[in-house]
Amino acid sequence: MWKCANCHHVGLTEDRPFHCPVCGADADKLVPHQVSGIKGTKTLQNLKAGFVAESQAHQRNLAFAFKAEQEDYAQVARLFRAIAEAEGIHAFNHLRLLSGVSDTHENLQAAFERENLASKTYPQFIKEANEEDNVSVARIFSYSRDVEAGHAKLYKKALEHMVQEADTKYYVCSVCGYVSDGELPEQCPICGAPKEKFRGID
């Protein structure tokens, strides 16, 4: 991030532009900037809440776009995707202000820890869904639990091999989210979906 010394505009991009987009000041007036002094404040709580809300809006609009495409509303689908992109930008900006993006090694470590935590959270969700006779919800939670454990293994593997980064192709099951590294499975080991349900990630 950077801040204009003239007009105090804050830019959220990594790279400084040649001029401030608000007042036109030259690049030498655009100085590095970090948000500080927000620990324990409502601003910090609002940034966290904003990140969650924008992330949810991003994903919700992608789901709405998918449904619009199924119903042959191509223009509406494009609108939902465009707004999803904007909401994703908002979420990313909030996360950066929360110092939630570090170097790649730290990001992998944080992602590994979050996946481990998530896989430990799901057993309680599954138990409660079963107790309330919500079998389909329990199944989705079971898929998520099993897939999160796999994600943690992939992050750990990446952490161990960062120095000698291999060119690996990933395949994601569009039913349960299972990620296969290196080869396309004949069927998903978590939900049993056929290989046609996998998408390659470049």
Q: What do these predicted ranges mean?
A:
Residues 1-202:
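Non-heme di-metal
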